[in-house]
Amino acid sequence: SMFGVISAGQPRTHAGLRKIGFFYLKKFTVGRRPLSLYSYENDVIRPLGEPRVHFALNCSAVSCPTLPNIAFTAQAIEQELDNEARRFINDTRHVRLDTREQVLYLSEIFKFYREDFVPAHSASLTAYVNRYHVTPVPLDYRVRFIAYDWTIAAAPR
């Protein structure tokens, strides 16, 4: 989506992006095939069955994963995706524990793409988080979702 933001200009909100059909109507050529960002994510990337991509993809919103400062390579993709999963899951903007209330707060990314994480790769969202979180989360904690902030992320200054 960064290419699209650069070429179309930076709107202030994702509502603005939707108005211009940014994710659904704007087409980019991928392998000689015109695809929208929505089609590329849902018809090309997600069918690969790799949930860690959700921690590497960035839609330019505040709640998106931080855009990696590396180019992913075929030789190191497994390690790179693990690093992004670990970084996202250990960032309290995306995953938080409330030990007093016994609640695991998760980014809505886990809600939007739940079927990519469970049951294909783990028995529960908590079990998936435990693969990367520095502090093991008890499996009996309730799961709540952190509201997604669709505000366009500002470039660091």
Where do the language-model regions lie?
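Interaction/scaffold regions that mediate signaling and macromolecular assembly across diverse proteins
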Residues: 2-157
